[in-house]
Every structure is written in structure tokens, then in C-alpha cells.
Amino acid sequence: MKNLTDSFVYLGHWPSAGSFGFNTDILATNPINLSVVFGVLIFFGKGVLNDLLDNRKQRILNTIRNSEELREGAIQQLENARARLRNVETEADKFRVNGYSEIEREKLNLINSTYKTLKQLENYKNETILFEQQRTINQVRERVFQQALQGAIGTLNSCLSNELHLRTINANIGMFGTMKEITD
């Protein structure tokens, strides 16, 4: 306590204001200087420090608000993306099902058209075979007829005389003429 009262006593023996100098007595001047410096710092620095802290607080709050808004926007975008993904997956499933149905339908159409084509080819083959059989039969008939005719002509030529032959030809021509008149 004596030290405390001694410091006030020293205040009474303050040096005159006329001289300016550097006080080297650290123990005597330090608490007073420190209290004055702290007092000035507290008095003037309090407002500046409050302003700095308020500005920092506002920036932090703004950053938090912006982060919250960005988070809400990101959550909304995520929900929208999930909804679009569900829609795309649903449509992909529809396309997949429709694709399988379309493939089955095309497969059946291809099988049916191939069956029809094979049936037509079978019919064409049968018609061609029938046509070739008829043509071959007609050719055989024609050859048989020509051979029979040539054989008959040969037999007639050997059996008939020229005069008999001419009469037979004239009689046959007459018969053909009569038949022609009847048919006309």
C-alpha cells in the first residue's frame, strides 16, 4: 500500500512543464504511461475496434446467409436433377419396353414375310414344273404325231400309186373344205 501512496506523492512533485525530456526512470513512469496509453487506446480504439468487429460480424453473417442461400439453391437444383433423372429413367424404361416390343413385332413381320415369300416361291416352282411338264408332254406328243404322220405318209407312199394318192389328197381337201364351211 505504501507503493500506491508513493506513486500519488510523486504526482505532487511533477516536474515543470517547461522542459521536455526523455524520462529514463522506467519504474516511476511506466505504470502512468501504460495507464494513459491504455486509457487512450480504450477510449479511441473502442469505437474503431467495435466498428471492425461489427464489420467482420456483418461479413460473416452475410457469408453465412449467402452460403445458406447457395445451399438451398443447390438443394433445389439437386431435387430438380433427381426429378429429371427419374423422368429420364421412366422414359428410358418405356423406350426399352417399346424397343423390345418393336423388335418382337419386326421379328414376327420378318418371319411372316419370309413365309409368304417362300410360299410364293414354292407356288412359282410348282407352276414352273407344271409348265415344263406340259411343254415336255406337248413336245413328246408333237414328235410322236410327226413320227406317226411320217410313218403313215411313208406307208401311204409305198402302198399308193400316184393317181390314188392324188385322189386321196383331193378327197381330204374336199372334206376339209366342207368342214370349214360348216364351222364358219
From Swiss-Prot:
InterPro entries xrefs: ATP_synth_b/b'su_bac/chlpt
Complex formation: F-type ATPases have 2 components, F(1) - the catalytic core - and F(0) - the membrane proton channel. F(1) has five subunits: alpha(3), beta(3), gamma(1), delta(1), epsilon(1). F(0) has four main subunits: a(1), b(1), b'(1) and c(10-14). The alpha and beta chains form an alternating ring which encloses part of the gamma chain. F(1) is attached to F(0) by a central stalk formed by the gamma and epsilon chains, while a peripheral stalk is formed by the delta, b and b' chains.
Protein name: ATP synthase subunit b, chloroplastic
Keyword tags: ATP synthesis, ATP-binding, CF(0), Chloroplast, Hydrogen ion transport, Ion transport, Membrane, Nucleotide-binding, Plastid, Thylakoid, Transmembrane, Transmembrane helix, Transport
Domain of life assignment: Eukaryota
Family affiliation: Belongs to the ATPase B chain family.
Transmembrane segments: 27-49
An annotated GO cellular component: chloroplast
Annotated localization: Plastid, Chloroplast thylakoid membrane
Membrane topology classification: Single-pass membrane protein
HAMAP family, per the entry: ATP_synth_b_bprime (MF_01398)
Molecular function terms from GO: ATP binding; proton-transporting ATP synthase activity, rotational mechanism
Misc: In plastids the F-type ATPase is also known as CF(1)CF(0).
Species in which this protein is naturally found: Arabidopsis thaliana
Summary of the function given for this chain in its UniProt record: F(1)F(0) ATP synthase produces ATP from ADP in the presence of a proton or sodium gradient. F-type ATPases consist of two structural domains, F(1) containing the extramembraneous catalytic core and F(0) containing the membrane proton channel, linked together by a central stalk and a peripheral stalk. During catalysis, ATP synthesis in the catalytic domain of F(1) is coupled via a rotary mechanism of the central stalk subunits to proton translocation. Component of the F(0) channel, it forms part of the peripheral stalk, linking F(1) to F(0).
